[in-house]
Amino acid sequence: MLNRVRSAVAHLVSSGGAPPPRPKSPDLPNAASAPPAAAPEAPRSPPAKAGSGSATPAKAVEARASFSRPTFLQLSPGGLRRADDHAGRAVQSPPDTGRRLPWSTGYAEVINAGKSRHNEDQACCEVVYVEGRRSVTGVPREPSRGQGLCFYYWGLFDGHAGGGAAEMASRLLHRHIREQLKDLVEILQDPSPPPLCLPTTPGTPDSSDPSHLLGPQSCWSSQKEVSHESLVVGAVENAFQLMDEQMARERRGHQVEGGCCALVVIYLLGKVYVANAGDSRAIIVRNGEIIPMSREFTPETERQRLQLLGFLKPELLGSEFTHLEFPRRVLPKELGQRMLYRDQNMTGWAYKKIELEDLRFPLVCGEGKKARVMATIGVTRGLGDHSLKVCSSTLPIKPFLSCFPEVRVYDLTQYEHCPDDVLVLGTDGLWDVTTDCEVAATVDRVLSAYEPNDHSRYTALAQALVLGARGTPRDRGWRLPNNKLGSGDDISVFVIPLGGPGSYS
């Protein structure tokens, strides 16, 4: 049997079947993502081999290409098979012998307990160099690496309905961010307020001075102050939108199935930017204090936004859904009765007379992890999902899903950080079974067992967090020490020391 499998795999390789084309990089003509001294980006861990010789070459190649793990894990083919084992659920981390991640970042992940065929989480950790695109003064110049900026980048992407969107975002989102920052290189390095407009040709008057424009001067007596920080936030928001648009364009040609939640951290010029679209979360643990750096975006947390859209555009609901929320599904026998409800403007509840339209399925239903939009999806922000439709219907769900992240900023220069101060990023596989306080307790317990200058301490912490959420196999399932069910989802965790590269790298 083994020989037949080997023969089949050899036949597939020799048949010359090519994997689907890779999505285009937004960074043409220059696609490098690191300074000249940095090593070029390596290919991702090799895809898993096909397990059957009966599949056609095209299908087998597609199956192999559909599973990959982050490059920095440096997995061998055998390690890749162990990472894909639902029974053992071995925790994966970068090898001790390999090059450390930037900032001595810790990382660990584990596959789900059978929820999906492969691990649909993806991760990325990069040092990205940004070349300026133009001079703010309007004088064209050639890009110079000496005048650029570097930013540190971490990303967790929790895929659903397939891993294609998460894999694509993990390879390209940081490049979209870099592209958006190119116009800001000189502006961010200049302490003066940002110009209102960027000149397009030499000699164009500075648009921050409106004296060259016609009209009453009184209308220019006041101008909003825009901070450098808000420019970076806007660049990140635009990058998320452009990434989502690229997925829409290329989803068929590149097998970008499903969608993904995206949690991204950027360190630039002394500040940490945390951008979240989905139900992954990030917290800072600083001297025992817990500082939330993101929040979940679910049908419950965004109920009013969803209901408002359904109210303003009822055609998106068809004749199947109502934008109103009721404590439970309305029954036909309750027509004419007064029942509790709430609409897009309400945080409380009131009574209304039940009408025929109220018998439709509610746009937002369920609660907690069972809350759904249009009875289909449990997250309301993320990337992808352009082909997602209501079951047995042609109604698209994408209009209700936002690709824009919420961005929170943390100024590292405002505090004196010790080696035990960390930023913890985790997909929902961690947070579904672990509270913020439990994470903080694990941070204290694990880091206290290591010397402050031991670079492996943050990887050990990431592993402990993943193991704590996964549990141990017992009673036909994965159980926590309190005998509650462990997380059966994919779990991915970054631990970023807030001391930065100068102290710990």
Swiss-Prot record:
Sorted alphabetically, which keywords does the UniProt record give? Hydrolase, Phosphoprotein, Protein phosphatase
User: What is the main EC category here?
Assistant: hydrolase
The similarity annotation says: Belongs to the PP2C family.
Span list, region Disordered:
1-103
Task: Kindly list the biological process annotations in GO that this record carries.
Answer: signal transduction
Catalyzed reactions per annotation: O-phospho-L-seryl-[protein] + H2O = L-seryl-[protein] + phosphate; O-phospho-L-threonyl-[protein] + H2O = L-threonyl-[protein] + phosphate
* Cleaved signal peptide residues: none
Q: Keyword check for S-adenosyl-L-methionine, yes or no.
A: no
Pfam families from the xrefs? PP2C (PF00481)
Enumerate the GO terms in the molecular function aspect.
[pyruvate dehydrogenase (acetyl-transferring)]-phosphatase activity
What cellular component terms from Gene Ontology apply here? mitochondrion
Q: Supply the name of the protein.
A: Protein phosphatase 1J
Report domain PPM-type phosphatase positions. Answer: 104-498
Relate the assembly described in the record.
Interacts with UBE2I/UBC9.
Question: InterPro entries in the record, alphabetically?
Answer: PP2C, PPM-type-like_dom_sf, PPM-type_phosphatase-like_dom
